[in-house]
């Protein structure tokens, strides 16, 4: 070991640039290549990773291993370069027992409440930072268009503007408002914008498949949210798994160099996703060996290489054989060291803080925030007047369904025992989670009986016939197959329903059907769930007692006829008369059961709105609202193209009336002359019901005639507006003319002169929007 105490790179009074230059000059090639590697700590052999491989970063580090890793750096390495420790803290610190698990990212988007999303990011950072983890691989900025894709739950939905608003907010929360290059407070963590870019544009929903994306399509929809957080200072970017135009994103010069580093002047750190470099050799087969893969990855601008152990030998060979100039290694390592100096890790490795762990993780304040977000993350999509339900002594509530009392499935993916780590086999503490059954038992008044029946199973697990391990050595999970029908479970649920005044049926999906490698060919409910719903709907028709269906799932699913009517060219809605109300709760987190029970019992007003469109049938996909204008006809020969529920939809327990929109600042000339101008639109909004409620007023812009094909309308602003019964407010929106853009055939974003529509209202559906126009010269 060398005494490094007096060396310049150890001197906190020197500028970071001088410290980096000094340290870089002392490092061997092996040490520099090691700094570019982030490896999986679950192997347990920390000495091999840190001492032999010289790794600069680790992930998936258990609570027991984290302090030991830091000690190994300090006592067994030559230069004592601190580790940067990352983990998947996707909607809370997923893999720390007792941490606050919020609704999924898609659930948070359902709130249409950026302030709450920022608060969730802040709370997550406060908890994560106590544990010695410095960096979360969040948020996901992918656009969810094909809902068969397994990672829809990790997104903020289908609209680029909404994604940008939510991503910007959560990044500010994680980083405590710090921008790229600025020091991070003790209770802040680095954010990571992923998966750059176009990863979600799959073939048939299949995860990590080739993305059929032109530069124009990328510029039009997929890049704007990333551009926003890049310019606002998101500390790191993660690169997607997929290929575009035959080039894996990891090696895509146009995206990494021309756009991100070039046009956007991004100075942060780039990290590959899991084994991207290795996959180019063993799966995509676009690189002959690890030396060529490592050389091309570094040349493309990658800094940290996630979980590709052979990058170490490959990069060293590439330098020594002339495939790669060592100066490019130096540039990448300089950016990694800058990140570590920014975090102050050389002076304070940010070890786990036991006192803060006790007081911050799962704190009362964070649990209250979690409940507030859960309340806003539920979208009521159908209600014939049965809700809110008045529970009282002598009444009976049947709570049925396989997810009504499943605490861990309620949390969704990236939460304890969802499959990513091995130290939480039981998941998050049961006592911290309020299931829907728990919620009704807590809230039902004395003398009101709450009775549970499972009703159906969702999946059975079987061995994967392709073997126990993937080609990269990771264990293959068991396969999920649709569960066999269980008549006894169904009979018990039907009997429970017949004896009750209200039936709440909770259905959805499970983590084995969600996530990486877990895309689905269909969107139907699996197992005996549809049979259960149809049987319960028959009971509701016979007894006249209300049936409420709660879909608790990772993504929109195709609901049976008893919920949405019988599909066809013309939908037969008469078959949906057995279900009185339908609501969606996208993995609502630890407090989701309480929030849902509060909504059904009328203690909380539903205010969630859909961040993503619900199809009637998987064959309708894609159904996102902002599709390009122009096709022959507006329906299939055998099925409507109208979705079950559209982007922006959601009901409350009161009603709202919109006035006519006006542009209040039209110039004397009648036209807005420059892109520096701002259009101010106003509309009156009145609560015409008898309850206090919250409306999400949405503003869409449509360019009426465009030189290049474009969508009919795009979300450009929204506001949550709370109104007392009978109250009227004037809601104002400021829309910069510079935001009223299209993208031309050369992939340039432009504002064209001409007439524009301003559409304001309740949802993305034309029938829900009030219209006015303005003109740009």
PLM region descriptions:
Residues 1-744, 752-766, 773-777:
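Glycoside hydrolase catalytic-domain context in secreted enzymes
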């Amino acid at each position: 070991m060398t005494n490094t105490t007096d060396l310049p790179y150890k001197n906190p009074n020197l500028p970071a640039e001088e410290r980096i230059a000094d340290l870089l000059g002392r490092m061997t090639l092996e040490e520099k290549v090691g700094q570019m590697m982030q490896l999986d700590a679950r192997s347990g052999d920390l000495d091999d990773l840190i001492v032999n491989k010289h790794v600069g970063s680790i992930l998936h580090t258990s609570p027991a291993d984290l302090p030991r890793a830091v000690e190994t750096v300090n006592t067994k390495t030559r230069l004592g370069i601190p580790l940067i420790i990352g983990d998947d803290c996707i909607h809370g610190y997923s893999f720390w027992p007792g941490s606050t698990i919020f609704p999924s990212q898609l659930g948070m988007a359902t709130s249409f409440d950026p302030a709450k999303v920022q608060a969730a990011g802040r709370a997550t950072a406060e908890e994560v930072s106590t544990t010695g983890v410095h960096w979360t691989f969040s948020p996901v900025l992918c656009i969810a268009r094909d809902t068969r894709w397994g990672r829809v739950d990790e997104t903020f939905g289908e609209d680029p503007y909404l994604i940008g608003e939510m991503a910007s907010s959560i990044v500010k929360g994680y980083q405590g408002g710090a921008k790229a290059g600025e020091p991070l407070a003790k209770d802040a963590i680095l954010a990571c914008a992923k998966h750059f870019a176009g990863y979600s544009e799959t073939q048939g929903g299949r995860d990590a498949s080739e993305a059929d994306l032109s530069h124009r399509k990328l510029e039009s929809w997929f890049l704007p949210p990333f551009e926003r957080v890049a310019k606002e200072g998101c500390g790191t970017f993660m690169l997607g798994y997929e290929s575009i135009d035959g080039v894996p994103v990891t090696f895509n010069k146009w995206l990494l160099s021309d756009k991100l580093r070039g046009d956007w002047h991004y100075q942060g750190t780039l990290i590959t996703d899991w084994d991207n470099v290795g996959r180019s050799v063993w799966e995509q087969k676009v690189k002959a060996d690890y030396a060529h893969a490592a050389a091309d990855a570094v040349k493309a601008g990658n800094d940290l290489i996630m979980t590709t152990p052979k990058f170490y030998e490959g990069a060293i060979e590439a330098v020594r054989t002339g495939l790669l100039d060592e100066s490019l290694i130096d540039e990448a390592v300089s950016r990694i060291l800058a990140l570590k100096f920014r975090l102050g890790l050389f002076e304070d490795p940010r070890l786990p803080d036991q006192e803060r762990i006790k007081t911050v993780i799962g704190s009362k304040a964070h649990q209250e925030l979690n409940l507030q977000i859960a309340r806003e993350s539920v979208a009521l999509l159908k209600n014939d007047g049965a809700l809110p339900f008045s529970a009282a002594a002598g009444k009976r509530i049947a709570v049925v369904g396989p997810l009504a009392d499943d605490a861990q499935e309620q949390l969704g993916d990236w939460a304890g025992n969802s499959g990513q780590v091995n130290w939480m086999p039981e998941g998050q503490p049961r006592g911290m989670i309020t299931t829907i059954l728990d919620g009704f038992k807590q809230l039902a008044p004395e003398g009101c009986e709450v009775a549970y029946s499972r009703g159906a199973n969702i999946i059975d697990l079987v061995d994967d016939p392709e073997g126990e391990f993937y080609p990269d050595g990771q264990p293959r999970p068991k396969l999920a197959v649709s569960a066999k029908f269980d008549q006894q479970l169904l009979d018990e649920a039907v009997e429970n329903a017949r004896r009750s005044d209200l039936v709440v049926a909770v259905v959805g999906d499970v983590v084995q059907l969600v996530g990486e490698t877990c895309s689905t060919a269909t969107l139907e409910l699996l197992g005996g769930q549809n049979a259960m719903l149809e049987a319960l709907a028959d009971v509701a028709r016979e007894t006249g007692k209300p049936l409420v269906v709660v879909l608790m799932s990772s993504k929109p699913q195709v609901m049976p006829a008893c919920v949405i009517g019988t599909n066809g060219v013309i939908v037969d809605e008469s078959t949906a008369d057995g279900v009185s109300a339908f609501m969606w709760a996208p993995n609502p987190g630890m407090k989701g059961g309480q929030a849902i029970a509060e909504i059904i019992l009328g203690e909380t007003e539903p205010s969630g709105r859909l961040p993503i469109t619900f199809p009637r049938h998987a064959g309708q996909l894609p159904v996102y609202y902002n599709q390009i204008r122009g096709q022959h006809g507006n329906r299939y020969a055998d099925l409507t193209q109208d979705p079950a529920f559209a982007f922006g939809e959601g009901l409350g327990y009161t009603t709202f009336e919109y006035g006519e929109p006006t542009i209040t600042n039209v110039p004397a000339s009648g036209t807005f002359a420059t892109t520096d101008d701002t259009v101010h639109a106003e509309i009156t909004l009145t609560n015409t019901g008898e309850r206090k409620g919250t409306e999400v007023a949405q503003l869409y812009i449509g360019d009426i005639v465009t030189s290049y094909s474009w969508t009919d309308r795009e979300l450009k602003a929204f506001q949550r507006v709370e109104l007392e019964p009978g109250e009227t407010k004037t809601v104002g929106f400021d829309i910069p003319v510079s935001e009223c853009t299209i993208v031309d055939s050369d992939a340039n974003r432009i504002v064209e002169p001409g007439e524009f529509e301003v559409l304001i209202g309740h949802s993305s559906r034309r029938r829900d929007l009030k219209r006015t126009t303005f003109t740009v010269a």
